[in-house]
UniProtKB/Swiss-Prot annotation:
Gene that this polypeptide is encoded by: ispF
Positions bound to a divalent metal cation: 12, 14, 46
Function according to Swiss-Prot or TrEMBL: Involved in the biosynthesis of isopentenyl diphosphate (IPP) and dimethylallyl diphosphate (DMAPP), two major building blocks of isoprenoid compounds. Catalyzes the conversion of 4-diphosphocytidyl-2-C-methyl-D-erythritol 2-phosphate (CDP-ME2P) to 2-C-methyl-D-erythritol 2,4-cyclodiphosphate (ME-CPP) with a corresponding release of cytidine 5-monophosphate (CMP).
Protein name: 2-C-methyl-D-erythritol 2,4-cyclodiphosphate synthase
Biological process, per Gene Ontology: isopentenyl diphosphate biosynthetic process, methylerythritol 4-phosphate pathway; terpenoid biosynthetic process
Pathway noted in the entry: Isoprenoid biosynthesis; isopentenyl diphosphate biosynthesis via DXP pathway; isopentenyl diphosphate from 1-deoxy-D-xylulose 5-phosphate: step 4/6
Length: 162
């Protein structure tokens, strides 16, 4: 039986540290802290990448772009997302939609969401109205509420290519 649709879920979290730029959804945001990681540590794009790879049955971001590989040191996560999308496409899938939540006590994500939507839509080759980004604080609770990190969760739907 051929299944015409697949759902993928992605999650990522990175610690906030001084001395690094803050890049979320491919958008550089002015902030006192940035995200720590091997690449540019774009928590949102990493979660999107995991969601599309997972839905296509292709594993996760670590399988394709391991943080032990020096080629990905400081890598632009938009480049990684486009490469992951090429692999999803080669496997016969297309993205139907992306629904994402960025979990951050600070900074405010809302003002940057339209640019993030535009980046993700462009990198996945889909219309802007097929990408949704929400922002949530942790109401001061836990490591996110203490502003020690930022997390992202993503759900995506893929359809078999016609």
């Amino acid at each position: 039986m051929t299944i015409p649709f697949r759902v993928g879920q992605g999650f990522d979290v990175h610690a906030l540290v001084t001395g690094r730029p803050l890049i979320i959804g491919g958008v550089r945001i002015e902030h006192s802290h940035g995200l720590l990681g091997h690449s540019d540590a774009d928590v949102l794009l990493h979660a999107v990448t995991d969601a599309i790879l997972g839905a296509a049955g292709l594993g996760d971001i670590g399988r394709h772009f391991p943080d032990t590989d020096p080629r990905f040191k400081g890598a632009d996560s938009r480049v990684l997302l486009r490469e992951a999308m090429a692999r999803v496409d080669a496997a016969g899938w297309q993205v139907v939609n992306v629904d994402a939540t960025v979990h951050a006590q600070a900074p405010k994500i809302g003002p940057h969401a339209p640019a993030m939507v535009a980046n993700i839509a462009a990198d996945l080759g889909i219309a802007h109205d097929l990408v949704n980004i929400k922002a949530k604080t942790n109401e001061g609770l836990g490591y996110l509420g203490r502003k020690e990190g930022i997390a992202a969760t993503v759900v995506t739907l893929l359809a078999r290519q016609a």
